[in-house]
């Protein structure tokens, strides 16, 4: 099993989730806790790296399945399948955050939606209003569906490389997210 599509998704997730979880560093000088700066840097770095890597792993999973499905499905259904896979992976990722940092008094469930791309569109009125009907996962579905459909329309059918589609789909998601 070669993870051909995994790495583009994972690499896209690392800077995205590094930005999302940058707030970990707001407690950086742990002087109030009596630790020196070097030790406090390491105390914060470890959970930051574990969280960013763990969250990026799921975008890598999406990239892997998007790459795999593009070889097995008809071209017309590719945006539908990619959007469905992304929504499923995002839902599983929300559970993972709670499991990763479970402790006494922790809540497990799909309510840890930190970093969901749908939140980047919260300032757009029609998107925000439509979220009451289909939620953040519907917005995620729409983002990936439109992005992958646009890239499919722009890509010639006889383009030789089989490794490009997952990167194209992930790039479409990145463009839509970061152009907000």
Report the location of each language-model feature.
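Membrane-embedded alpha-helical bundles of multi-pass enzymes
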Residues: 1-180
């Amino acid at each position: 099993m070669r993870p051909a599509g995994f790495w583009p998704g994972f690499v896209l997730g690392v800077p995205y989730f590094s930005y999302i979880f940058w707030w970990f560093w707001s407690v950086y000088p742990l002087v109030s806790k009596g630790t020196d700066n070097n030790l406090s840097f390491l105390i914060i770095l470890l959970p930051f790296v574990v969280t960013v890597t763990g969250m990026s792993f799921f975008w890598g999973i999406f990239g892997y399945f998007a790459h795999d499905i593009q070889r097995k499905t008809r071209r017309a259904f590719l945006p539908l399948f990619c959007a469905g896979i992304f929504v499923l992976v995002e839902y599983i990722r929300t559970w993972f955050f709670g499991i990763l940092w479970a402790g006494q008094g922790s809540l497990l469930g799909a309510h840890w939606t930190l970093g969901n791309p749908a939140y980047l569109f919260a300032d757009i009125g029609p998107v925000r209003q439509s979220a009451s009907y289909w939620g953040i996962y519907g917005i995620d579905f729409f983002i990936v569906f439109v992005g992958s459909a646009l890239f499919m329309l722009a890509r010639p059918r006889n383009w030789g490389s089989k490794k490009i589609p997952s990167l194209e789909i992930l790039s479409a998601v990145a463009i839509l997210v970061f152009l907000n």
